[in-house]
């Protein structure tokens, strides 16, 4: 029996329907499990006080967020997730108007930055580099499917 590998999973946050649709289609065609949200407030992981994922499991392989969104800024959301113990190691922030302060803050918490308008090949380079390091037999948390 052939063992099916776990598909890569990405969470996408952007208030622009066009950007979400573009990224959803791109990752979906690559075989990813894709969850996209117009802002962090509508994602179940943002409402938990601590990381709800079981020990050793991450909610996703990648989190890609816009900087400027209604309700909560992407950098605030990602920083909060890191403080709560989020186990997703690969997080990136996109914006067309990063300030020097945004750049310094994002880099200080280990975020990859993509300046809009970005080329999809920039994101492809980032994910392909990381895909090579991800164990295909890893398990991902699925607690938020039950919410």
Task: Give short role names for the model-derived ranges.
Residues 36-62:
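Acidic, metal-coordinating helix/loop segments flanking the phosphotransfer/catalytic sites
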Residues 66:
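Active-site residues of response regulator receiver
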Residues 93-95:
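Hydrophobic/aromatic residues positioned on beta-strands within the core alpha/beta folds
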Residues 39, 73-76:
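Acidic catalytic/metal-coordinating carboxylates
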Residues 70:
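The feature encodes the CheY-like receiver
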Residues 75-86:
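Short amphipathic alpha-helix used as the core "switch/output" element in two-component signaling
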Residues 118-128:
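C-terminal output helix
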Residues 17-42:
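Two-component/phosphorelay signaling modules centered on CheY-like receiver
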């Amino acid at each position: 029996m052939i063992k099916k590998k776990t598909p890569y999973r990405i969470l996408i946050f952007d208030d622009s329907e066009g950007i979400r649709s573009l990224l959803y289609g791109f990752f979906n065609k690559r075989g990813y499990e894709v969850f996209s949200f117009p802002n962090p407030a509508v994602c179940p992981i943002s409402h938990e006080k601590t990381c709800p994922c079981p020990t050793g499991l991450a909610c996703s392989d990648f989190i890609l967020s816009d900087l400027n969104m209604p309700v909560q800024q992407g950098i605030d959301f990602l920083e909060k997730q890191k403080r709560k113990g989020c186990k997703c190691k690969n997080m990136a922030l996109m914006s067309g108007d990063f300030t020097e302060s945004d750049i310094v803050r994002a880099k200080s918490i280990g975020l990859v930055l993509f300046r809009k308008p970005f080329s999809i090949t920039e994101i492809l380079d980032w994910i392909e580099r990381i895909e090579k390091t991800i164990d295909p037999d890893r398990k991902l948390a699925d607690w938020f499917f039950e919410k």
